[in-house]
């Protein structure tokens, strides 16, 4: 079923209300319902291409509003998990975890670590994966106390991030950060 932008916004707000109020369980709403309903901010910018002189100008404004948010489809997350085959002792991180789609396919929730900048997506991830170690933070400030066996994720793309090393594209910064937090081979 395809929802309009307005319907998606309203559904996202209802999900957040259920989590904030603690009424999801008492109303019979399951974690699976929350997982399937919350879509995040991607595509909810309300911009129209016709209002911009170029596709580039439209795309830049869209990136600014959405902050690069796009939740990885569950089938892709499942494929990644099946390809990696993490064991029950492997510790897995997603440095821009969104609502935690990759965690859904990991063998042990308490071995999942995530960082998320968007407070709403973080709230949903925390609700869905209460055993995971999640941090509401910018990936650039994320300093975990341990190293990981695997880093999975779908970083924001083509955002210009300013770091102590200068300007970097977000996806390249993600790769550098992943290398820093992975266990040595």
Residue ranges and their predicted role:
Residues 1-185:
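Class I S-adenosyl-L-methionine-dependent methyltransferase catalytic core
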């Amino acid at each position: 079923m395809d929802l309009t932008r307005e319907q998606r916004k309203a559904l996202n707000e209802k999900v957040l209300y259920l989590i904030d109020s603690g009424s999801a369980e008492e109303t019979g709403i399951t974690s699976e319902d929350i997982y399937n309903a919350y879509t995040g901010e991607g595509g909810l910018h309300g911009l129209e291409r016709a209002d911009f002189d170029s596709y580039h100008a439209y795309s830049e404004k869209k990136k600014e509003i959405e902050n690069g948010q796009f939740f990885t489809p569950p089938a892709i997350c499942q494929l990644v998990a099946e390809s990696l085959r993490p064991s029950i002792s492997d510790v897995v991180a997603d440095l821009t975890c969104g609502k935690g789609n990759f965690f859904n396919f990991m063998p042990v929730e308490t071995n999942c670590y995530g960082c998320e900048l968007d407070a709403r997506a973080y709230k949903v991830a925390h609700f869905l994966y209460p055993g995971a170690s999640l941090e509401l933070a910018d990936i650039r400030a994320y300093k975990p106390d341990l190293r990981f066996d695997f880093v999975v994720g779908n970083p924001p793309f083509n955002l210009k991030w300013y770091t102590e090393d200068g300007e970097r594209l977000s996806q390249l910064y993600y790769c550098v950060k992943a290398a820093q937090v992975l266990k040595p081979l």
